[in-house]
Amino acid sequence: MIKRKESKKSILKIIIMFLIIFILFLLYAYFIGTKGLIVKEYKINASIPDSFDGLKIVHLSDIHYNRTIKEKELKKIVKQVNLINPDIIVITGDILDNDIDATDSKEILIKYLKEMNAKIGKYAVNGNHDLRYDYWNDLMESVNFKILNNTYDLVYYEENEPIVIAGMSSYFDDIDINEKLKDYYNFISENDVKYKILLLHEPDTIDNINNNFDLILAGHSHNGQVRLPLIGAVVLPNGSKRYYKEHYTINNSELYISSGLGTSTLPLRFLDHPSINFYRINTK
């Protein structure tokens, strides 16, 4: 009897210990993991026109505004972006998470997105969460972001030799992937452009496109959002099952995936702080 009682006490102690660890994990993942904004800087040597040598691109993604990212966090993000003094700012989807139309939250979001400064231009593509809201296009245009859903833009700086930035809408929009980049491929077939950038939301999409880009920037995966030692990402959304880590080299393309700024599904982050990606591109 004594041994049984001691055994039950031991099991109870183990259960209590695991509960305490789990509660501490949740507290950390919510109160600390979702904070602590970091900047990830990447230096890229590429065959880019000389006039773009030293090009600075800031890459934001997955804000999921009004969940863990609210006005206080937006203010910090904008301050950090403007400290970098970027030439180009890109957003690869999921600015929105819930409906903020006709609310003060929408006006706050507009205010801070307008305050982001870029010397050359600001570009965006939508994400699967943005697709829910018809006002996404108007919102982005009102804050001076050029929308690149299934189109492209020739970007000039100082000289006449441009680079091209193309974009794809979220693959959840039911548009055939080959159709999305049709205009871009028609242009590239007739024009020699030295450096080509693609913006998209779901990184797994690249397996279905013609590999014709030097730099591909994506989001969606949050790099796992909750990552455990020895295990890695706990849950990955459809569209980022294959590609979800920070960086991949695929044939001649460099793919960078943002860990995002906000959270999706659960308001938790572990071993994966919200981040701004900063690319400094130099000529080879």
Model segments located where?
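Beta-strand-turn-beta hairpins that frame and shape the catalytic cleft
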Residues: 45-58, 145, 152-167, 192-195, ...
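Structural motif
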Residues: 57-59, 90, 123, 165-167, ...
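Mobile, glycine- and charge-enriched loop segments
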Residues: 36-69, 187-197
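Catalytic metal-binding/acid-base residues of hydrolase active sites
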Residues: 64, 96, 128-130, 152-153, ...
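Conserved beta-sheet core of the metallophosphoesterase superfamily
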Residues: 203-280
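Membrane-embedded segments
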Residues: 51-154
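N-terminal membrane-anchoring alpha-helices
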Residues: 1-50
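Binuclear metal-dependent hydrolase catalytic cores centered on His/Asp/Glu-rich metal-binding motifs
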Residues: 134, 138, 142-145, 151-152, ...
